[in-house]
């Protein structure tokens, strides 16, 4: 991206992570500052739910609900979690040999894969995963699988497969599965990918080897701070600078980059101008405020109304102040196409997920409708989080689904205010 910056700001209660491109905010997340040190958290004291993502716990099963094929368990005292039993992966029990059943009182190794959202508990899985910049290691599922990101084309996959034809990687695949991430497309030689996989394999081995000696509610693994993993997980071509005005965050980021992304270290900058804050330099307060408002204006004069609810998000497209001289059909077509691009941006920026229903301005021509769906799908493919156009209903409503990973931006900001 042109003139793109990943900005980290340390506030009183949270760390802001902002992806800015040509002055526009593309992504924003607010991460609460930890209330306790790592040692206290590791002992299983109740922590902030938003800090759990990716962490591995020895959870205790409270009850199994057969009619929904799921179990509810505790990660720490008072912190419940939801475990679907549809996953065919065999759970790793620490209190007894697994006999095909999961029972109340069982102590099971789980990893948090989705944060708590509103009234819903965090979602955990028994299929553990360890993420690096180029690969994800799955040490507890069916071994031997080599899976490539759907965004990697066939020619790229062929090159990457060649990089993996090494004895060390074959040994890893005998006990684990691997997912090769989209970031691997940047590689021109295989050593960074191989070293990334071997580092993950060593980490997984260390954690699994001590799991049997840990007590219930123990936290065996807590990944690097979420704002740091964004550096690793954001595609390298999406930013040309990593900027912070906090010496503490700068040092944390420097150490993280040296270990996991040495090629990105030159992008890290410490902003030190006392005359104007980094927040004011880019007008970030106003941009964050706009990212939580209900109405979003389009350049054409049209606007979106974005209304999240408990069950889904509804987006209404309106012609608003549009004063063009084009025919009605062309007017509606142009506003809808502009709205499609802005909707894709807003979903990513606000971190809206689940079911999204969009009420575009009515169009009669089937070719215009097809063009709109194709344009919306094309825009959504730019989102690092999987987002899919499902269909247009007979009433002209467009249904989108977006994978739930983190909570909406409004919730993140409200929690930390």
Model feature map: region roles:
Residues 1-49, 53-55, 125, 129-135, ...:
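Extended, charged alpha/beta regions that create polyanion-binding interfaces
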